[in-house]
Amino acid sequence: MNQIHLKCHSDKICPKGYFGLNADPYDCTAYYLCPHKVQMFCELNHEFDLDSASCKPIVYDHTGSGCTARMYRNLLL
């Protein structure tokens, strides 16, 4: 059952025909190389930024615009 869940998750991250990088929806520090569905990770204290297709330093408070800051704001609402 767990394998079915993982396949559904990776099919949404790397849809058929998509080539490039895509952010992991559950882990701000991870991203995928599509179409191979290879999970990659940013270095410590960095998060993946889809707009620049690169890892950027994490801003841990509400002033940032990255994934971690967005999750931080959502937790405070």
From Swiss-Prot:
This is Protein AC145. InterPro entries: Chitin-bd_dom, Chitin-bd_dom_sf. Keywords: Host nucleus, Virion. Its main location: host cell. It is found in: Host nucleus; Virion. One of its GO terms (molecular function) is chitin binding. One of its GO terms (cellular component) is host cell nucleus. Plays a role in primary oral infection of the host. It comes from the Viruses. It comes from Autographa californica nuclear polyhedrosis virus. The keyword S-adenosyl-L-methionine does not apply.
